[in-house]
């Protein structure tokens, strides 16, 4: 079994991604052919469930873009279901310390290395037991990425990086900036300093640093610092801003206004 995304991170090849929040297999397939290295199927803030994640995995499968799935929480039951429908790479949100990082890894591994329940006869991941030796090879194909999104997590970064089985650490700029007292302003100098220091520390530990940043200059800056998986946009934002720009060119006025948001 192979995991092309995990292999790319191990080889130190930067991977450029797009965030998927439309929770729709049709739009997922549309962007799967756009040329991104990876696509994040968001189960934390988008209206996804196991079934919608499954259909998006199926839609993306024929294309070179690699799927990454974010569960809503570091929950072994939910993680088990996502792995069974075919997710190999998980982005686990709001990991605060090494114990929680170890829990995330354990949820992705079959015993004795972890606690993943065995149900391969029912699982798309094993192609319903048509993949020879799936139960013995699946553990090595798993890619576990954990999110650090608070000052507490930042203070525990060194111990998180020591956890065996963690392939990458993703910095969540939106929640981090809020936790630092700068909600909606991840570009604040204090937040940027924390992000940049974390990227350097993660890379120095031999793990892959990751982040979501739609600001092109900042995204390129993070890549220069050593970030290896960087999402540079969100499908909902692309659709909303693109639709607004098209309408504006023909004289339409925006009916709603509000905060510009982080992405």
From Swiss-Prot:
<dbReference type="GO" id="GO:0046872">
    <property type="term" value="F:metal ion binding"/>
</dbReference>
<feature type="binding site">
    <location>
        <position position="149"/>
    </location>
    <ligand>
        <name>a divalent metal cation</name>
    </ligand>
</feature>
<dbReference type="GO" id="GO:0005737">
    <property type="term" value="C:cytoplasm"/>
</dbReference>
<feature type="binding site">
    <location>
        <position position="175"/>
    </location>
    <ligand>
        <name>a divalent metal cation</name>
    </ligand>
</feature>
<feature type="active site" description="Proton acceptor">
    <location>
        <position position="45"/>
    </location>
</feature>
<dbReference type="GO" id="GO:1901023">
    <property type="term" value="P:4-hydroxyphenylacetate catabolic process"/>
</dbReference>
<protein>
    <recommendedName>
        <fullName>4-hydroxy-2-oxo-heptane-1,7-dioate aldolase</fullName>
        <ecNumber>4.1.2.52</ecNumber>
    </recommendedName>
</protein>
<feature type="site" description="Transition state stabilizer">
    <location>
        <position position="70"/>
    </location>
</feature>
<keyword id="KW-0479">Metal-binding</keyword>
<feature type="site" description="Increases basicity of active site His">
    <location>
        <position position="84"/>
    </location>
</feature>
<dbReference type="InterPro" id="IPR012689">
    <property type="entry name" value="HpaI"/>
</dbReference>
<keyword id="KW-0058">Aromatic hydrocarbons catabolism</keyword>
<dbReference type="InterPro" id="IPR023701">
    <property type="entry name" value="HKHD_aldolase_ent"/>
</dbReference>
<dbReference type="GO" id="GO:0043863">
    <property type="term" value="F:4-hydroxy-2-ketopimelate aldolase activity"/>
</dbReference>
<dbReference type="InterPro" id="IPR050251">
    <property type="entry name" value="HpcH-HpaI_aldolase"/>
</dbReference>
<dbReference type="InterPro" id="IPR040442">
    <property type="entry name" value="Pyrv_kinase-like_dom_sf"/>
</dbReference>
<keyword id="KW-0456">Lyase</keyword>
<feature type="binding site">
    <location>
        <position position="174"/>
    </location>
    <ligand>
        <name>substrate</name>
    </ligand>
</feature>
<comment type="subunit">
    <text>Homohexamer; trimer of dimers.</text>
</comment>
<comment type="function">
    <text>Catalyzes the reversible retro-aldol cleavage of 4-hydroxy-2-ketoheptane-1,7-dioate (HKHD) to pyruvate and succinic semialdehyde.</text>
</comment>
<comment type="similarity">
    <text>Belongs to the HpcH/HpaI aldolase family.</text>
</comment>
<dbReference type="GO" id="GO:0010124">
    <property type="term" value="P:phenylacetate catabolic process"/>
</dbReference>
<dbReference type="InterPro" id="IPR015813">
    <property type="entry name" value="Pyrv/PenolPyrv_kinase-like_dom"/>
</dbReference>
<feature type="binding site">
    <location>
        <position position="147"/>
    </location>
    <ligand>
        <name>substrate</name>
    </ligand>
</feature>
<dbReference type="Pfam" id="PF03328">
    <property type="entry name" value="HpcH_HpaI"/>
</dbReference>
<dbReference type="InterPro" id="IPR005000">
    <property type="entry name" value="Aldolase/citrate-lyase_domain"/>
</dbReference>
<comment type="pathway">
    <text>Aromatic compound metabolism; 4-hydroxyphenylacetate degradation; pyruvate and succinate semialdehyde from 4-hydroxyphenylacetate: step 7/7.</text>
</comment>
<feature type="binding site">
    <location>
        <position position="175"/>
    </location>
    <ligand>
        <name>substrate</name>
    </ligand>
</feature>
């Amino acid at each position: 079994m192979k995991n092309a995304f995990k292999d790319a991170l191990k080889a130190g090849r930067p991977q450029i991604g797009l965030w998927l929040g439309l929770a729709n297999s049709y739009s997922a397939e549309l962007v799967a052919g756009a040329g991104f290295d990876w696509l994040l199927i968001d189960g934390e803030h988008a209206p996804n469930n196991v079934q919608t994640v499954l259909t998006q995995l199926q839609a993306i499968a024929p294309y070179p873009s690699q799927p990454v799935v974010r569960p809503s929480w570091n929950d072994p039951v939910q993680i088990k279901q996502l792995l069974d429908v075919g997710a190999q790479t998980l982005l686990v949100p709001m990991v605060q310390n090494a114990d929680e990082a170890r829990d995330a890894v354990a949820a992705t591994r079959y015993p004795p290395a972890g606690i993943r329940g065995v149900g391969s006869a029912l699982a798309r991941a094993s192609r319903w037991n048509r993949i020879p030796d799936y139960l013995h090879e699946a553990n090595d194909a798993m890619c576990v990425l954990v999110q650090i999104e608070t000052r507490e997590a930042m203070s525990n970064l060194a111990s998180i990086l020591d956890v065996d089985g963690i392939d990458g650490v993703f910095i969540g700029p939106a929640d981090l900036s809020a936790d630092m007292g700068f909600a909606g302003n991840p570009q604040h100098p204090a937040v940027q300093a924390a992000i940049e220091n974390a990227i350097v520390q993660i890379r120095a530990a031999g793990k892959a640093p990751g982040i979501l940043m739609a600001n092109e200059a900042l995204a390129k800056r993070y890549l220069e610092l050593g970030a290896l998986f960087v999402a540079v946009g969100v499908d909902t934002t692309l659709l909303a801003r693109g639709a607004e720009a098209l309408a504006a060119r023909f004289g339409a006025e925006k009916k709603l206004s509000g905060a510009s948001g982080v992405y």
